Regions:
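Gram-negative bacterial Sec-dependent N-terminal signal peptides
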Residues: 1-23
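Short, solvent-exposed loop/turn segments that connect beta-strands within catalytic domains
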Residues: 152-153, 194-199, 241-242, 323-324, ...
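Surface-exposed coil loops of outer-membrane beta-barrel proteins
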Residues: 110-133, 171-186, 194-302, 482-487
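Beta-barrel outer-membrane channel/assembly domains of diderm bacteria
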Residues: 23-26, 30-196, 204, 237-240, ...
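Gram-negative outer-membrane beta-barrel proteins
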Residues: 105-113, 151, 167-171, 193-195, ...
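Detector for outer-membrane/organellar transmembrane beta-barrel domains
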Residues: 237, 242-246, 262-263, 269-448, ...
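Extracellular structured ligand-interaction cores
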Residues: 94-96, 138-142, 156-160, 182-184, ...
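C-terminal structured domain segments
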Residues: 434-486
Length: 505
């Protein structure tokens, strides 16, 4: 009995202890689970925070990327606009450089220097030029710098300066004999938006310049008309679709401009009208007290010099060879009285008498005459009376013809024949003597070009030439200081040889 009770008590005690121990373990596990759950929650919170930060960073990256792309697009757009503006500016404004030059060497058949030049004959003193091919030994250069711009309102501006120099020496250093000078410096204003009616599209100008509508006969190195000086005017006043006019006032000086007592200036007022191919120009000239002008020694220069004058030109500018065939041609009839009797270089001769009268005709043309040939004939003739002294007379006529034979695209043979007749009666002026007679010149010139071989007006050219010239013996007596009759050239004929370059652009 005792043993059974004891055993029961022992079992009860053991069972209670185990139960208490189990309850203790469950509480610990539960606490641990709660702590673990808390840590998991905290980890989840931290992960969520990190995820939120990552999403925020990604959004910022996307925003930055978008902004960068926008900036790139803006930069590209600005660059495109800038390029367009720069291109537009380049199209509207810019500098230009143009020029003319010739230079060459010439010798006679003895290997010595010889006389040459388009104005070497006695008639050359009054403008009687002869063919220039194979007849020039000088170096002459013109350099033109221009700046042009077009404003947003459509108005245009143009500034031009021209520097030129001429030399007859073959040396490379020629400062002591230089004729370097500024021949042009002027400004033009065109298409002014406030100009209306006939003045719409016209061009104002002022400064020192060659007149825009001068023209010449290149093969004899002679201007048909050369109006130049310092002044101002207006071009292209349009009265209707076919009639336009130019108006200008030029000033020139006579005599030594460094002489403080010389105040004589020649003013030239010009009206120049164009109707289709026709040109009509009228000019009035005035040089107050020209007959009282004195030299640097105080001596009267010319007591019968003219103080006024008139000049007129009637021209025809064809885009065909005298209306007969393809090509071009220009013809002009000129008249001058008093100061206007120097009909080529208007207003350039202050020694003309008030009764001086001059008539001149000039004409030239160019045309192809076969597959490989082109021809350019020219005529220049003048009659001038009472020019420098009462009763004097200067009459002459030049006939010139140049031919080009194309050999290939870079080589041609050029031929030129020039004939001049003159009947000069200076009546003792400047110790000149009355003469009459003829001058002849023939030239053969193998010529190299880069292209447009048959075009009379394309350059540059390099020529090798030989020329034969002769004159009437009577012309030797005209003067002691001109080319003809001097030790360098006499009647009887002379051969000359040389080479020359010529260019313009």
């Amino acid at each position: 009995m005792y043993r059974k009770s004891t055993l029961a008590v022992l079992i009860a005690l053991l069972t209670g202890a185990a139960s208490a121990h189990a309850q203790t373990d469950l509480s610990t596990i539960e606490a641990r689970l709660i702590a673990l759950e808390k840590r998991l929650q905290e980890a989840e919170n931290r992960a969520q925070t990190a995820e939120n930060r990552a999403e925020s960073a990604e959004k910022k990256v996307q925003q930055l990327t978008a902004q960068q792309q926008k900036n790139q697009d803006t930069t590209q757009e600005v660059a495109q606009r800038t390029a367009k503006l720069e291109k537009k500016a380049d199209e509207k404004s810019g500098f230009e450089f143009h020029g003319y030059a010739r230079s060459g060497v010439i010798m006679n058949d003895s290997g010595a220097s010889t006389k040459s030049g388009a104005y070497m004959t006695p008639a050359g003193e009054t403008g009687g030029a002869i063919g220039r091919l194979g007849n020039q030994a000088d170096t002459y250069v013109e350099m033109n710098l221009e700046h042009k711009q077009t404003l947003d309102n459509g108005a245009t501006t143009r500034f031009k300066v021209m520097v030129a120099d001429g030399q007859t020496t073959y040396n490379d250093w020629t400062a002591s004999t230089s004729d370097l000078n500024v021949r042009q410096a002027f400004v033009e204003l065109g298409n002014l938006p406030t100009f209306a009616g006939p003045f719409k599209g016209s061009t104002l100008w002022a400064g020192k310049r060659f007149d825009r509508d001068n023209f010449d006969i290149h093969w004899i190195d002679s201007d048909v008309l050369f109006l130049a000086g310092t002044g101002g005017g207006i071009y292209d006043v349009k009265w209707n679709d076919s009639l336009r006019s130019n108006f200008s006032l030029y000033g020139r000086n006579f005599g030594d401009i460094d002489d403080s007592s010389n105040s004589v200036q020649n003013y030239i007022l010009t009206m120049n009208h164009f109707a289709g191919p026709l040109q009509m120009m009228v000019s009035g000239l005035r040089a107050k007290d020209n007959d009282e002008r004195k030299d640097t020694n105080g001596n009267l220069v010319k007591g019968d010099a003219a103080n006024t004058g008139v000049h007129a030109l009637l021209g025809l500018h064809n885009d065909s060879f005298y209306g007969l065939r393809d090509g071009s041609s220009k013809t002009a009839l000129l008249y001058g009285h008093g100061l206007g009797a120097e009909v080529k270089g208007i207003g350039s001769d202050g020694a003309l008498r008030s009764g001086a009268d001059t008539w001149r005709i000039a004409s030239y043309g160019t045309t192809p005459i076969g597959k490989n040939w082109s021809i350019a004939p020219a005529i220049l003739a003048q009659s001038s009376k009472d020019r420098y002294v009462d009763g004097d007379s200067y009459q002459w006529a030049t006939f010139n013809m140049r031919l080009i034979q194309e050999i290939n695209q870079n080589f041609a043979l050029a031929y030129e024949g020039s004939y001049q007749y003159m009947d000069l009666k200076p009546e003792g002026y400047n110790d000149r003597h009355a003469v009459n007679g003829s001058f002849y010149k023939l030239t053969f010139a193998p010529t190299f070009k880069v292209g447009s071989i048959g075009d009379f007006f394309s350059r540059p050219e390099i020529r090798f030439y030989t020329s034969w010239m002769d004159l009437s013996k009577k012309l030797n007596n005209y003067a002691s200081d001109d080319a003809l009759g001097s030790n360098g050239f006499n009647s009887g004929g002379e051969w000359s040889f040389g080479m020359q370059m010529e260019t313009w652009f």
